[in-house]
Structure formats: structure tokens, C-alpha cells
Design a protein with these regions (language model features):
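Sec-dependent N-terminal signal peptides
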Residues: 3-13
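N-terminal processing/targeting junctions
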Residues: 13-15, 73
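Generic detector of isolated residues embedded in canonical secondary-structure elements
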Residues: 15-16, 100
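An ectodomain-focused feature that recognizes extracytoplasmic/extracellular
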Residues: 16-60
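Short beta-strand/loop motifs in extracellular/secreted proteins, especially
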Residues: 59-63, 105
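Internal interaction segment
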Residues: 69-139
């Protein structure tokens, strides 16, 4: 019985939030219905969030992210683009996005006709590493 449970856990994809500092600061998370990547590039001084859904993203006038939990907030923009199944937003500041990811339980990315929700369980320590990377001096 233990072997069966071990095999199940080994073949189940990890749903953890992950931070990597190279080649650029990256915070990522994968669930069956969505992949999210938040990046910061010291060379361009731009933050980006890419939300990939297997169902794609229809053309929409606005894109929003709603954070539910201890510090609820909704952030909206009309400055987004889509490439294949990925919706992308770039900006010079992402404080509200990072706060939402760090201090809440779920995030729902949505347009007028499509939405995906992700768990933020375990995101906080990875967001803190991402923040440190984004503010670290570059030689």
C-alpha cells in the first residue's frame, strides 16, 4: 500500500510556487488549469506577469486580477496583450500584484468572458525571495 501511495505522489505534479533568480527574477506556479509567471528584468527595469490558460484568452478590453484573503484587492488594466494562450501585462511597478500574491489565499485572473483561479498557498516565502531579487543591486 505504501508503494502505491508513493507512486501516486511521485507522479502528481507539484503545485508549489517557485522562485528562481536567473536568468531574470522569476516567480512561477503551475496548476492543471493555469500557469503563472511573474518576472523582473534588471536590464529593462520591467515587471511582467504572464497567465497561460489551456483555453486561451479571448480578446478583451480589460484584464483584472482579484486577490481574496487577508488583504483583498482587485487590480485592472487595459495595457495587456495576448500571445497564443498567454495573457501578458508589463509595468515598471508591481507592488500591488506582489502584495496580493504574498498576503492572500487565492488569485483570480479574469477578463469579461474568461477566468482562472489559483491557490496562493506557499506563495509568501517565494514572493519574498522574488522581492529581494528585484531590489538587489546589479553589478
Amino acid at each position: 500500500m505504501r508503494i502505491i501511495f508513493s507512486l501516486i505522489f511521485l507522479t502528481t505534479p507539484a503545485l508549489a510556487w517557485e522562485f528562481t533568480p536567473t536568468p531574470i527574477c522569476t516567480l512561477s506556479h503551475t496548476e492543471p488549469t493555469v500557469d503563472i509567471a511573474v518576472t523582473y528584468d534588471h536590464a529593462t527595469h520591467l515587471y511582467a506577469i504572464a497567465v497561460t490558460s489551456p483555453d486561451g484568452w479571448p480578446d478583451a478590453a480589460a484584464f483584472s486580477i482579484r486577490f481574496d484573503g487577508a488583504q483583498p484587492n482587485t487590480i485592472s488594466t487595459t495595457r495587456h496583450s495576448t500571445e497564443a494562450n498567454t495573457l501578458i501585462v508589463t509595468d515598471v511597478g508591481f507592488g500591488n500584484v506582489l502584495d496580493g500574491l504574498e498576503f492572500n489565499a487565492t488569485a483570480t485572473a479574469f477578463t469579461q468572458t474568461a477566468a482562472v483561479t489559483v491557490s496562493l498557498m506557499g506563495a509568501a516565502p517565494e514572493v519574498q525571495k522574488f522581492r529581494a531579487c528585484a531590489t538587489a543591486p546589479v553589478a
